[in-house]
Amino acid sequence: MNVRAALPPCSILLLAGGRGQRMGGRDKGLIEWQGKALIEHLHALTRPLTDDLIISCNRNIERYAQYADQLVKDDDTDFNGPLAGIRAALPRARHQWLLVLPCDGPLVDEPLLRAMREKAFEYPQRPVMVREGQHWQPLLCMIPVACAATLEAAWLAGERSPRRAMEPLQPVAVQLEANDPRLANLNTPCLLAGINENDRK
């Protein structure tokens, strides 16, 4: 069977609902990198892959609306982290899988997303999560929508870590080498400037 041709459709969630503390309170998804907002880079990558593009955002709703089929927001104003956005998106997803990406990772590429989808095809009942060396990257994951109840139970029990919330579901790894450049996380002004500078060399 041609696995690539058989890949089921997925909903895609771009996480842009954080407080932006490391960016001085700025909305990370709207910060420019290489002349475009970070969310615009992720939109260009993911738009061809889904008819259900969801953005989790808690401010600048009008700006984000142009990049999404759906917007979701946390059910409170406490900025409880990325699990809040995942929790809000899972019941709204139109497909059986939700592929999750952070807005501050613009170097993620299509081959990595394809590898995640192929792994999900092999393990349809379990979350798929990127692992860089020995470290899990829980915000680069695919979650079966059928697992929403487990994550909701973890949330109601006080869990706020996506990785720990998914542990009972036995995530399957997409294994990458340590320091894979595609996982560069531009979550501080210095990192953002450093990547821009390196790209000029």
UniProtKB/Swiss-Prot annotation:
It is an enzyme of class 2 (transferase). Gene3D superfamilies: Spore Coat Polysaccharide Biosynthesis Protein SpsA, Chain A (3.90.550.10). Transmembrane segments: none annotated. It is found in: Cytoplasm. GTP binds at L15, A16, G17, K28, D74, D104. One of its GO terms (biological process) is bis(molybdopterin guanine dinucleotide)molybdenum biosynthetic process. Keywords: Cytoplasm, GTP-binding, Magnesium, Metal-binding, Molybdenum cofactor biosynthesis, Nucleotide-binding, Transferase. Its cofactor is Mg(2+). It catalyses: Mo-molybdopterin + GTP + H(+) = Mo-molybdopterin guanine dinucleotide + diphosphate. Its EC number is 2.7.7.77. Belongs to the MobA family. Transfers a GMP moiety from GTP to Mo-molybdopterin (Mo-MPT) cofactor (Moco or molybdenum cofactor) to form Mo-molybdopterin guanine dinucleotide (Mo-MGD) cofactor. This is Molybdenum cofactor guanylyltransferase. It comes from Pseudomonas syringae pv. tomato (strain ATCC BAA-871 / DC3000).
